[in-house]
Amino acid sequence: MQTRELSFAERCDWIRLYRTHTVGPVAFWGLMRRYGSAAKALENLSALIRRKDVRPPTVEQVEAEMDASEHAGVRILCAVEPDYPDLLRAVEPIPPLISVWGDTSLMRKPCVAIIGSRNASAIGQKFAAQIAGELGDAGFTIVSGLARGIDAAAHASSMNTGTIGVLGGGVDHIYPKQNTDLHLDMRERGLLVSESPLGYRATARDFPRRNRLISGLSLGVVVIEAAERSGTLITARYALEQNREVMAAPGSPLDPRTKGCNRLIGDGAALIETAQDVLDCLEDARADVMPTSLFDPASGYDNAPYSAALVQAEVDRAKDELLAAASFTPTHKDDLIRVSGVPAGLAAAALLEMELNAEIFVEVDGRISRS
């Protein structure tokens, strides 16, 4: 689909659809493929969602969000619009919309993420600041998650050259409180980005979305001090899935804060000790990132030439088989379909209805688990 500016009504429909409680990125694009527009998807949503407690926000509620955003100077960018970042369109599934507050031109520069431990050592924070400053001087925008430690050091050091803070909550929600001054400074001189609406306070389930945006906005991810079980390594995994460069600074084997970095290097991540190491890794990175199609062809079950009752009966049987194959451990969609034996087109229709009715939980990267 060609990029274009959405009308006020179209933007309202996109926001209503994506703000529906059980509509994540996978379901959003499934509905767009099936019905062709957010307006048509909203018209048919009640037939797909059998739970009476799940309904789209009203037009009035979304218009209030749009008015509040405009009043604050926040823009809501939908994935088809020209100012939506190209690198984020190469993520699968594409985040349907993002809220941005600040200097959006920073997304048009080449971006690199610098992430790491909240409880970082003094030397780790010094290294993050040094790398961020030198990469900023080389023309890169620095992306991070506005957390304590490595994130804060990277943001502060690149404030004059360009930095983007990605949040799990709304762009107006300051978290952690220790970073209040940094957050306020970034509104004026940097850029804040989130998939969440204004005023929203993040929960644990929102941070994977934030992490996926951090890697999605960036050509590569630099990891400085990360424990073996940390959100930082989740971001590194997303970067690999998005075909982005993963780089890590080595550390002492006696420091638990660097065990995750050392493991990444052992698994094939690039070892970096200087900003030049990062520049060398990113030299050809842009050519490796290909945009994703916004609208893949609909499955046969999205436009099936059968009676509605027959199609629904087949979908219901497929749902039972897919649910039996699912577990509480997130599983890749292709593996779930293969184990269930359900044909791919029928499985796509069934999984869409299952997500909309909260029978399954679909991670931001598309992996599926029982709710």
Language-model features, listed with the residues they occupy:
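Short, small/acidic-rich helices and loops at N termini and domain boundaries
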Residues: M1-D83, N357-E359, V364-S371
